[in-house]
Regions:
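N-terminal nucleotide-binding beta1-loop-alpha1 segment
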Residues: 1-25
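Conserved alpha/beta core of the MobA/IspD/sugar-nucleotide pyrophosphorylase nucleotidyltransferase superfamily
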Residues: 3-8, 158-240
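Conserved beta-loop-beta/alpha segment of the NTase-like Rossmann-fold superfamily
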Residues: 63-64, 71-138
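Conserved core of the sugar-phosphate nucleotidyltransferase
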Residues: 109-185
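ATP-binding glycine-rich loop module of kinase domains
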Residues: 233-264, 298-307
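Short beta-strand micro-motifs within the conserved protein kinase catalytic domain, predominantly
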Residues: 275-286
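Conserved kinase catalytic-core helix
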Residues: 299-358, 382-403
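Catalytic activation segment of kinase domains across protein kinase-like and atypical kinase folds
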Residues: 408-415
């Protein structure tokens, strides 16, 4: 592809305190719906750039470990010698860059790709002024005034910088940063001051976007999780004003079973599920409308978080409590083995058959599986063992209690 860009992602600071439930993480490795921010940025730019430079300082080691599979000629981590403001971070990153440049803040995901736009440009949005964002005035592409996180003095909406910029002349932009360092303005980041200077020589297109997902502020982060989740799962729609999730599924038998499981829970263990507002178990069009939770899943905590040992003990104690609480409700029946075999054997083998059809799992069925240096049987061999062992284990069982049939990390949310 012609006209490939360079991408700079400033990621020098950790997320604010209100987002540190997962630990003190930089925005670039903060999770949003089973991925981290960089996963989205990489997918967006990988076909449009020669390199992506991630500029780190706080918790740089965590970024290096988490992004290690990505590191290559195209993806590089650079560590600041000392922490300065945003302008100093960008200045350090610029080095001798001469080709067209994209600057994308590490906590900003915009689904519109600025690399597809010609010329100097940046994304913006309109909102009422607050001390959360950096706003601006512009005329004919020239930024005439910047309001850098200033309290509101007007009830009118103004344009704000989203956090994605395209610079066609990075050599001159570096000169603009040097001027901004000399003309210190306490109320404005040197980056925005330099951008203002740059726009006088190179007018910039201010492009409005509605596809902006911000993970650097608590309120916007949870709103972004809502919208990104709805985009990624075409059977989910979310009413963010009411906090209601509506779900459908092509796998109707499994989905109807899930709905019935929700509905049949005894009232004093309903705390484990969202409130249900509407549903249908009709085979024609099954659906459920339920309360949407924006909590992190245990999957996110395990893969992307930085929890202490005690925090993990607390998480598993809560899971154990739920499992023990379920044991209060039992069914005793001498002919229960068929239902148990359906749950523990048939369901497992059905899942294996689905996996076998997916290319990424197919080799696991024929070849030994190696995990952390230990080798295990191929899944075909494990299936054969299960078919013999599980029925024998169930012969003497005549009591069954409530269980969750898919209690995996991705299905457990922790507040």
């Amino acid at each position: 592809m012609d006209n490939l860009k360079r991408v700079i992602i400033p990621a020098a600071k950790i997320v604010p305190a209100e987002l540190q439930k997962l630990g003190k993480l930089p925005g670039i490795i903060y999770p949003i719906n089973q991925k981290i921010a960089f996963d989205y940025l990489y997918e967006e730019y990988k076909e449009y750039c020669t390199s992506m430079d991630i500029i780190c300082f706080e918790q740089a080691g965590k970024v290096q470990r988490r992004l290690n599979p990505y590191l290559s000629e195209q993806v590089r981590i650079k560590i600041l010698p000392e922490l300065g403001d945003l302008g100093q971070t960008i200045y350090f990153a610029l080095g001798q860059i001469k080709e067209s440049l994209i600057i994308n803040f590490s906590d900003t995901i915009v689904m519109d790709n600025i690399a597809k736009i010609d010329g100097d440009a940046f994304f913006c949005q309109e909102d009422y002024m607050s001390d959360t964002w950096t706003y601006f005035d512009e005329q004919d592409g020239v930024i005439t005034r910047v309001y850098d996180k200033k309290p509101a003095k007007t009830d009118k909406k103004k344009k704000l910088f989203v956090g994605v910029f395209q610079i066609e002349d990075p050599v001159y932009f570096k000169t603009c940063l040097e001027k901004a360092f000399q003309e210190v303005r306490p109320q404005m980041s040197t980056f925005y001051h330099a951008l203002q200077i740059y726009s006088r020589q190179h007018p910039m297109k201010a492009i409005s976007t509605e596809n902006w997902f911000d993970i650097g502020h608590e309120d916007k982060y949870y709103n972004s999780k809502l919208e990104v989740r709805a985009r990624e799962f075409n059977h989910i729609s979310i009413d963010k004003n009411r906090g209601i999730l509506r779900k459908t599924s092509d796998d109707k038998d499994k989905f109807i079973g899930e709905i019935k499981w929700y509905l049949k829970l005894p009232s004093d263990v309903e705390y484990v599920r969202p409130r249900i507002f509407d549903y249908s178990t009709s085979y024609v069009n099954p659906y459920v409308s339920m309360e949407y939770y924006a909590y992190h899943t245990v999957h996110e905590l395990f893969l992307y978080g930085d929890l202490t040992l005690q925090q993990w003990v607390d998480v598993f104690n809560r899971i154990r409590f739920v499992c023990d609480d379920f044991k209060r409700y039992t069914v005793k029946d001498g002919s229960i083995q068929h239902a148990l075999e359906e749950m523990y054997l048939t369901k497992t083998l059905q899942r294996f058959e689905r996996m076998k059809k997916e290319n990424i799992f197919s080799t696991f069925f024929e070849e030994p599986i190696e995990v952390n240096g230990e080798k295990y049987l191929p899944l075909n061999d494990i299936s054969a063992v299960l078919e013999k062992v599980i029925p024998k284990m169930l012969y003497e069982v005549d009591t069954f209690n409530i269980i969750h049939g898919d209690l995996c990390f991705a299905n457990i949310m922790v507040d």
